């Protein structure tokens, strides 16, 4: 039992009377306590003896106390509407990342397809030899790296509490576990160099750069902990899955010596993400009432309108994809100005350098504006009555609470939806790649515009996304 009887009875009453059921321990709380442990606790094996004391030596209460330290003390009522949205978004981001339903298979598939099937072609301006750059940085091929990540994750996903109690299996791994599977010893060393660190190393990293209580960047960077000798264990399987998805990109990025090379890598990754999204939606819309058009071009000058258009009956969904990563500082520091500036930079842009929603609104004005309508090559838009602007982000921020409403609020300063009358332009919708992957399964039987309209009808502010609805 983790709690004193009087505490346990109160918790049981609270849990039994709550709907939906409440939990005592949750992922972010556990990661937060682990973070404090590596930062401030002594590296002493005798500490483990405390677990044999009654009520875990008080650790249960420490977990409950951790809950009070996970939230930012930001005055809410005195803020503007935009600032209130940012405050809710800051809290939602950490909830989404820790509690959100994340598909392991989607992460594996997305990582593999972006790397192996949909990179920019060799010889194009966006091409970057990520295979060679990653091998130079890590000593591994991308295939070896992904296979080793999947192997470790599979071990932990198959592990049961009963196996651990019966000592039929263990949360601890050794280098021998890999070599028994036929993996070359040098490859194992290279892999563990990338994904693991000792508690002392993690402490140094967190003490050097830590943007707030919810910042688990270093656990994501090194999701496997090295303890005594060559014993290893994964701190968190979701961090391992995130490493599988983005580890190759960041290991390569951190090895590059110039900003020019890093810019080329980011451009390559953005094109790979766009190619992946177009493939996903093309497959989802095939033989359905949704007609999918990737990379549509203006008839007059051949420039790209937006990343894709989907015609759903008399509706048109204009899509823009953004592969940018939102910085840890902006997501976890609690600084409203930092988060606003990052969203402005990555998802909005300026009139001279448009990003995200500025690209979408400009495309809609160009095609449907009363005084500047421009034909789109090979797409008949004459029967379109309603236009849906949809932004898709590779970063999870696209699924956080309030992001659609926040982007709409910002768009109102440079885009008047009434200027497109008699056609109707809906407010802006925003989804993460995880969100669009989820709804793509329904496009064979349902119009995309109907799904978006249903979202709007039930939640006119579009505060809840398809991901946050499941956790908040």
Region roles according to the model:
Residues 296, 386-394:
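Extended hydrophobic secondary-structure segments that form protein cores and membrane-embedded regions
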Residues 284-311:
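A short acidic/basic microdomain associated with nuclease active sites
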Residues 304-306, 396-405:
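A short acidic (Asp/Glu
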Residues 1-68:
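Long, charged/polar, low-complexity intrinsically disordered N-terminal extensions
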Residues 281, 308-310, 317-323:
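Conserved catalytic cores of phosphodiester-cleaving nucleases, focusing on short active-site segments
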Residues 323-387:
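Catalytic cores of nucleic-acid endonucleases
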Residues 333-337, 403-410:
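Short secondary-structure boundary/capping segments
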Residues 6, 12, 67, 71-284, ...:
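Interfaces and regulatory segments of ATP-dependent nucleotide/adenylate/phosphodiester-chemistry enzymes
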């Amino acid at each position: 039992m983790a709690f004193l009887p009087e505490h346990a009875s109160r918790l049981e009453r609270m849990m039994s009377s709550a709907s939906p059921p409440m939990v005592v321990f949750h992922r972010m709380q556990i990661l937060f306590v682990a973070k404090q442990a590596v930062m401030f606790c002594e590296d002493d094996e005798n500490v483990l003896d405390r677990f044999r004391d009654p009520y875990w030596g008080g650790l249960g209460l420490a977990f409950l106390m951790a809950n009070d330290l996970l939230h930012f003390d930001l005055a809410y009522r005195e803020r503007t509407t935009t600032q209130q949205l940012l405050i809710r978004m800051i809290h939602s981001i950490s909830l989404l990342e820790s509690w959100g339903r994340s598909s392991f298979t989607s992460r594996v598939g997305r990582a593999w397809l972006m790397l192996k099937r949909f990179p920019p072609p060799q010889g194009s301006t966006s091409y970057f030899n990520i295979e060679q750059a990653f091998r130079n940085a890590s000593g591994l091929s991308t295939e070896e790296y992904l296979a080793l990540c999947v192997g470790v994750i599979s071990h932990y996903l198959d592990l049961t509490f009963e196996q651990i109690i019966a000592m039929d299996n263990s949360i601890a791994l050794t280098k021998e576990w890999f070599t028994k599977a036929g993996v070359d010893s040098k490859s194992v060393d290279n892999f563990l160099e990338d994904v693991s660190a000792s508690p002392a190393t993690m402490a140094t990293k967190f003490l050097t750069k830590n943007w707030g209580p919810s910042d688990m960047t270093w656990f994501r960077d090194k999701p496997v902990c090295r303890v005594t000798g060559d014993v290893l264990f994964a701190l968190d399987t979701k961090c391992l899955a995130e490493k599988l998805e983005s580890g190759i990109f960041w290991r390569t990025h951190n090895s590059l010596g110039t900003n020019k090379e890093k810019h080329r890598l980011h451009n390559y990754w953005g094109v790979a993400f766009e190619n992946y999204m177009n493939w996903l939606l093309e497959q989802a819309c095939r033989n359905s009432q949704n007609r999918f058009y990737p990379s549509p071009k203006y008839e007059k000058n051949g420039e790209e309108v937006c990343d894709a258009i989907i015609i759903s009956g008399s509706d048109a969904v204009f899509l823009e994809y953004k592969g940018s990563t939102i910085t840890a500082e902006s997501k976890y520091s609690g600084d409203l100005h930092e988060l606003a500036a990052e969203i402005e930079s990555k998802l909005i842009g300026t009139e001279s350098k448009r990003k995200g929603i500025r690209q979408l609104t400009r495309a809609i004005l160009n095609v449907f504006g009363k005084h500047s309508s421009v034909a789109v090559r090979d797409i008949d838009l004459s029967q379109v009555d309603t236009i849906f602007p949809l932004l898709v982000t590779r970063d999870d921020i696209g699924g956080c609470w309030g992001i659609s409403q926040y982007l709409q609020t910002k768009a109102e300063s440079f885009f008047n939806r009434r200027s497109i009358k008699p056609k109707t332009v809906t407010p802006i919708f925003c989804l993460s790649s995880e969100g669009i992957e989820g709804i793509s399964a329904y496009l064979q039987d349902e119009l995309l515009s109907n799904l978006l309209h249903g979202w709007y009808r039930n939640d006119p502010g579009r505060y809840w996304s398809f991901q946050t609805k499941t956790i908040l």
